[in-house]
Amino acid sequence: EFTTDGVMPSAVSVETMSQLAEHVWPRGAERGGAGELMLGGVDVRDLAQEFGTPLFVLDEADVRWRARAFRDAYAEAGASWVFYAAKAFLSVAVARWVHEEGLGIDVASGGELAVAMRAGVPGEALLMHGNNKSMAELQTAVEYGVGRIVIDSFEEIARVAEAAAQAGVVQQVLVRATVGVEAHTHEYIATAHEDQKFGLSASGGAAEEAVRRIAKLPSLTLVGLHSHIGSQIFDAAGFEVAAARVVALAQRIYDEQGIEIEELNLGGGMGIAYLDSDDPLDVQEMAGQIGDIVAKACAESGIATPRLAFEPGRAIVGPAGVTLYEVGTVKPVELDHGQIRTYVSVDGGMSDNIRTALYGADYTVTLASRVSQAEPMLCRVVGKHCESGDVVVRDAWLPGDLTPGDLLAVAATGAYCRSMASNYNFLPRPAVV
């Protein structure tokens, strides 16, 4: 018998299909009197009518609440900066929201930097990433006064030094170290094992050599080390090994070069719930555990505990976002042993959410435009693109009376959907409201 998310058909009912799990949907999500989905007090049917579908809907209050939660939790854990990872979702409005709540912004391209600048975020609140920053991007960053640039290669040391010298400033930099730790995440988004394009090896000596080269350049000053161990992390175990190795690197740098590492940026990666069965750590619990891990590692190494910095992205904006689709076709397909899977085609797909096809990501979907008393049917929500892998939600229980014109809402699409969107098949990109 078919299941979805480990749920047997016998456990699915009309009532459970319409429920909105608090840890999956935005904090302001609720049902109206006719069963319609309400987001922040707004009827999604009205949004679809005014802005069309597909439509990205972002709950500002939810984003701000999560930004404050990270700011406060990590400050208590010893962080001097929490940088919002702009790659997850960026617009002028979102940049303003997170900055107004006390966060800096981590940008990874000239385009992201331009949006942050347009939003009025001061340079000192910005950190710039990227494994292949162009000279033009670096010059813009330095001239704007970006507070920190993360060094990702030997070539980049010379480029940043040249840009800073031309601008007549001393640029603060961090060295991104790969520490051979892989979080329990999908292979394509785990980024701390050694065989990868990011960073400089801690075990092979490249990170220490980068520090040595930076120290010789008058237009650069090293403020710290950076490490990022992956994405969708649900526990702090990976950080324990990573922190120990980065602290050991900091100790070697001090012992051999006399340079004290003042700041340790442990990146982002905190997971969110896409399904009811997902159970990510509370931000305060995660922050406290990581703070304790770093303090313990420093104490064991005999070095002062550096200031901490973090880069949450998905965990701030992901749960705040919902995508609305309109159903176009409903097609029952007979499978083996008489089982039926119903293919529900919507007016978007992999052009607005590539994550299902790219990572095998799972999502939660619900009927958003009305109430239904129909029995559950096993559905596969698919897009309208010319690809068999164009799947939005692989398996979901939806009402058996689903019909063209109904609205579906997919939860937790605030991160890496719009930012990775395309115009495949020349579909226009959805609006954001």
Feature names for model-found ranges:
Residues 1-20, 179-331, 398, 425:
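Active-site loop/helix belt of alpha/beta enzymes
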Residues 1-172, 208, 212, 216-217, ...:
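A charged N-terminal "starter" segment
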Residues 11, 289, 295, 303-433:
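Charged (often Lys/Glu-rich) extended helix/loop segments that serve as interaction or gating elements
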Residues 39-42, 58-65, 77, 89, ...:
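Conserved active-site and cofactor/substrate-binding residues in soluble primary-metabolism enzymes
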Residues 62, 89-91, 112, 133, ...:
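Short, glycine-/Ser/Thr-/acidic-enriched flexible segments
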Residues 81-83, 102-104, 123-127, 148, ...:
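Structural preference for beta-strand elements that scaffold enzyme active sites
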Residues 94-96, 117-119, 138-143, 160-163, ...:
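Short acidic, glycine/serine/threonine-rich loops at helix termini
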Residues 129, 152, 228, 267, ...:
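Conserved residues at the C-terminal ends of beta-strands
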